C-alpha cells in the first residue's frame, strides 16, 4: 500500500519538476505547494485516522 503511494508521489513530483522548468521560478514554487499540500494532508489524515 505505501509503496503504491510513494510511487504515485514520485510520478507527481517528476511531472511537477518538468512543469517547473517551463514556468517562472516563483510561480512554479506556488504551483508545487498547491499541488503537493493536499496530497500530504490526505496521506497524513488517512494514516492517522485509521
UniProtKB/Swiss-Prot annotation:
Bias (Acidic residues): 14-30
Keywords: Amidation, Cleavage on pair of basic residues, Secreted, Signal
Cell compartment(s), UniProt: Secreted
GO cellular component: extracellular region
Stretches the record annotates as Disordered: 12-31
UniProt note on tissues of expression: Expressed by the skin glands.
PTM sites of type Leucine amide: 48
Signal peptide: 1-10
Principal cellular location given in the protein's record: secreted
Propeptide: 11-35
Functional description taken from the UniProt entry: Amphipathic alpha-helical peptide with no antimicrobial activity. Does not display anti-leishmania activity. Does not show hemolytic activity (LC(50)>116 uM).
Family according to the record: Belongs to the frog skin active peptide (FSAP) family. Temporin subfamily.
Record's miscellaneous remark: The peptide is not detected in skin extracts.
Record's protein name: Temporin-SHb
Species this protein is from: Pelophylax saharicus (Sahara frog)
